[in-house]
């Protein structure tokens, strides 16, 4: 199967991948293309920009959390009704789980998808030396097709031309455009990285202006040519994560989605929907009650610490959720969702805001990142998603710390080495119907995660 596709990779973090990927996606959409956008790795924030730019949900591609077949199935799933695929990389092109073990790198994903790569180089502090960087990236792994280069943070057109000529002369790689250094093209950041698109603001205008700028200095026709000349796609795997025909809804699951909670892998939502759950979105910040006739609740990660005052003040929603838990409704909460279920959130200024109190203890924001990285875990006790003994893969990234309450642990950590044997996650509720954890799970690691959530939600409320 032939399908136009391109990978936008950087030589490092802060190369401008999200800026250029979002602007390029929007520029392609303005030309009438239906872009299937993807983000390499476990990040939640960048996919929001690609979703906004493409007006279509962005999927994460992760070759460490997912098997080759599962990752490829997610890729094919995202191609439906699209005419070109754009994949934004993660960190530098060759950066992955570790230097000794493959997995998770942009290069590996490009190789698995047989996709050409456009390499981004931030030239703000160099000139001809940019050629050495490109040459090194080309030679490190000849299996990776670096088909072109985009230069970011050029000081002037003359600066760009100096770098372009050196790269094309010494690295024999075409340079297909640039972006000038411009503080107005910088996406705002906070402690977890870029600001989320769920926080509103003028991001749509920002992305459209970015697309206009990219049209003027980057050869998009050349990018389309590279994408169309990509070799045939690898064979489509047999369906495992998504049924060939979506199931009719058998239950409703309420999904928290607003400024406080927006971290969901699109594949998780699609798997729930395709296997028989009607998803009903609600806002713990703004709504006073849950959607009607639901059988389960899914509260993802996000920035509850930023919206702590609003979450704390919304007593009707807190009362509704507390009652749902007491009634035995299955509730799954990840990271920010876990914080919402705790007694209170203590923010960076040491101000405490009362939360649901389903989970004993206070979630305290730390002055530095508390834990980060890929994680492998064994299910220690049966819960609403998985059975004891099941092995799962996920990602942890949080600034808060919650003292371990005296509740039944959900998982035992198997990886990374410094956390082996530690407990992670909590099973609470009179009927052990609530699962809360800092571990972000991609349901593609095991399709039974989605199926089990649907089954137990159906037992609580059938439609």
UniProtKB/Swiss-Prot annotation:
Residues 252-448 form the GATase cobBQ-type domain. The record marks 440 as: Increases nucleophilicity of active site Cys. It is an enzyme of class 6 (ligase). Keywords: ATP-binding, Glutamine amidotransferase, Ligase, Magnesium, Nucleotide-binding. Its cofactor is Mg(2+). Its EC number is 6.3.5.11. GO terms for biological process: cobalamin biosynthetic process. The active site is at residue 335. InterPro entries: CbiA/CobB_synth, Class_I_gatase-like, CobQ/CobB/MinD/ParA_Nub-bd_dom, GATase_3, P-loop_NTPase. It comes from the Bacteria. Pfam families: CbiA, GATase_3. The keyword Repeat does not apply. CDD domains: CobB_N (cd05388), GATase1_CobB (cd03130). The keyword Magnesium applies. It catalyses: cob(II)yrinate + 2 L-glutamine + 2 ATP + 2 H2O = cob(II)yrinate a,c diamide + 2 L-glutamate + 2 ADP + 2 phosphate + 2 H(+). One of its GO terms (molecular function) is cobyrinic acid a,c-diamide synthase activity. Comprises of two domains. The C-terminal domain contains the binding site for glutamine and catalyzes the hydrolysis of this substrate to glutamate and ammonia. The N-terminal domain is anticipated to bind ATP and cobyrinate and catalyzes the ultimate synthesis of the diamide product. The ammonia produced via the glutaminase domain is probably translocated to the adjacent domain via a molecular tunnel, where it reacts with an activated intermediate. The a and c carboxylates of cobyrinate are activated for nucleophilic attack via formation of a phosphorylated intermediate by ATP. CbiA catalyzes first the amidation of the c-carboxylate, and then that of the a-carboxylate. Belongs to the CobB/CbiA family. PANTHER family: COBYRINATE A,C-DIAMIDE SYNTHASE. NCBIfam families: cobB, PRK01077.1. Catalyzes the ATP-dependent amidation of the two carboxylate groups at positions a and c of cobyrinate, using either L-glutamine or ammonia as the nitrogen source. This is Cobyrinate a,c-diamide synthase. It comes from Dehalococcoides mccartyi (strain CBDB1). The lineage of its organism: Bacteria, Bacillati, Chloroflexota, Dehalococcoidia, Dehalococcoidales.
């Amino acid at each position: 199967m032939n399908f136009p596709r391109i990978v936008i990779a950087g030589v490092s973090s802060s190369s401008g991948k999200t800026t250029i990927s979002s602007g390029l996606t929007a520029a392609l959409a303005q030309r009438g293309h239906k872009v299937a956008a993807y983000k390499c790795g476990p990040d939640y924030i960048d996919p929001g920009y690609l979703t906004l730019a493409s007006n279509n949900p962005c999927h994460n591609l992760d070759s460490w959390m997912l098997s080759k077949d599962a990752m490829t199935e997610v890729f094919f799933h995202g191609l439906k009704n699209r005419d070109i695929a754009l994949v934004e990389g993660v960190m530098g092109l060759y950066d992955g789980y570790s230097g000794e073990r493959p997995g998770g790198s942009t290069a590996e994903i490009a190789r698995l998808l047989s996709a050409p790569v456009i390499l981004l180089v931030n030239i703000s502090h160099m000139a001809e030396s940019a050629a050495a960087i490109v040459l090194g990236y080309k030679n490190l792994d000849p299996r990776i097709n670096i088909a072109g280069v985009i230069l970011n943070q050029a000081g002037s057109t003359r600066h760009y031309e100096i770098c372009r000529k050196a790269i094309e002369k010494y690295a024999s790689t075409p340079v297909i455009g640039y972006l000038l250094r411009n503080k107005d093209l910088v996406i705002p950041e906070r402690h977890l990285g870029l600001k989320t698109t769920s926080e509103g603001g003028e991001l749509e205008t920002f992305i459209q202006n970015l697309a206009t700028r990219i049209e003027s200095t980057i050869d998009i026709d050349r990018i389309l040519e590279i994408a169309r000349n990509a070799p045939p796609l690898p064979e489509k795997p047999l369906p495992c994560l998504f049924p060939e025909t979506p199931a009719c809804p058998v239950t409703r699951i309420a999904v928290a989605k607003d400024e406080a909670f927006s971290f969901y892998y699109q594949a998780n939502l699609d798997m729930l929907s395709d296997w028989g759950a009607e998803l009903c979105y609600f806002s713990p910040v703004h709504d006073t009650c849950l959607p009607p006739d639901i059988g389960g609740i899914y509260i993802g990660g996000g920035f509850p610490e930023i919206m702590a005052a609003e979450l704390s003040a919304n007593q009707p929603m807190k009362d509704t959720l507390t009652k749902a838990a007491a009634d035995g409704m299955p509730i799954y909460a990840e990271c920010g969702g876990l914080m919402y279920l705790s007694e209170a959130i203590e923010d960076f200024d040491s101000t405490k805001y009362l939360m649901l109190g389903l989970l004993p203890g206070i979630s305290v924001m730390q002055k530095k990142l508390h834990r980060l990285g890929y994680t492998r875990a064994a299910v220690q006790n049966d819960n609403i998603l998985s059975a004891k003994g099941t092995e799962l893969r996920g990602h942890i990234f949080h600034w808060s710390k919650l003292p371990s309450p005296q509740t039944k642990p959900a998982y035992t950590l198997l990886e990374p080495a410094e956390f082996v044997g530690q407990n992670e996650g909590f099973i609470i509720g009179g009927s052990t119907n609530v699962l809360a954890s800092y571990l972000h799970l991609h349901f593609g690691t095991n399709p039974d995660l989605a199926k089990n959530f649907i089954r137990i939600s159906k037992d609580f409320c059938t439609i």
